[in-house]
């Protein structure tokens, strides 16, 4: 079975996010009043596995070993079986 995987990675609350701060300042200079700006990285890929459970295990391992730094990042995973 083929699965579409989406991993959304963001800094944990309280972590300094210079990219978001820069965006917020730039928007203010353009006249837009925004607050609580945050940024999120999204990684998408497909996997061919026998079961949803196998994909979940592998993606969790990927996140812990490479995609995320669990000390500073929170992440959400979305997995959908592809038709066909």
From Swiss-Prot:
One Pfam assignment: PurS
Subunit: Homodimer. Part of the FGAM synthase complex composed of 1 PurL, 1 PurQ and 2 PurS subunits.
GO biological process: 'de novo' IMP biosynthetic process
Any one GO MF annotation of this record: phosphoribosylformylglycinamidine synthase activity
Keyword Ion transport found: no
Family affiliation: Belongs to the PurS family.
Function: Part of the phosphoribosylformylglycinamidine synthase complex involved in the purines biosynthetic pathway. Catalyzes the ATP-dependent conversion of formylglycinamide ribonucleotide (FGAR) and glutamine to yield formylglycinamidine ribonucleotide (FGAM) and glutamate. The FGAM synthase complex is composed of three subunits. PurQ produces an ammonia molecule by converting glutamine to glutamate. PurL transfers the ammonia molecule to FGAR to form FGAM in an ATP-dependent manner.
Catalytic activity: N(2)-formyl-N(1)-(5-phospho-beta-D-ribosyl)glycinamide + L-glutamine + ATP + H2O = 2-formamido-N(1)-(5-O-phospho-beta-D-ribosyl)acetamidine + L-glutamate + ADP + phosphate + H(+)
Domain of life of the native organism: Archaea
UniProt cross-references to HAMAP family, sorted A to Z: PurS
UniProt pathway: Purine metabolism; IMP biosynthesis via de novo pathway; 5-amino-1-(5-phospho-D-ribosyl)imidazole from N(2)-formyl-N(1)-(5-phospho-D-ribosyl)glycinamide: step 1/2
Keyword Electron transport carried by entry: no
Chief location of this protein within or outside the cell: cytoplasm
EC number assigned by the record: 6.3.5.3
GO cellular-component term (any): cytoplasm
Entry's localization field: Cytoplasm
Annotated gene: purS
This protein's name: Phosphoribosylformylglycinamidine synthase subunit PurS
Entry keyword set: ATP-binding, Cytoplasm, Ligase, Nucleotide-binding, Purine biosynthesis
Enzyme type, top EC level: ligase
């Amino acid at each position: 079975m083929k699965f579409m995987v989406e991993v959304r990675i963001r800094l944990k609350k309280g972590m300094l996010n210079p990219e978001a701060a820069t965006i917020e300042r730039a928007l203010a200079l353009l006249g837009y009043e925004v607050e609580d700006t945050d940024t999120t990285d999204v990684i998408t890929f497909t996997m061919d596995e026998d079961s949803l459970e196998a994909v979940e295990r592998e993606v969790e391992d990927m996140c812990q070993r490479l995609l995320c730094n669990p000390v500073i990042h929170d992440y959400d995973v979305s997995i959908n079986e592809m038709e066909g």
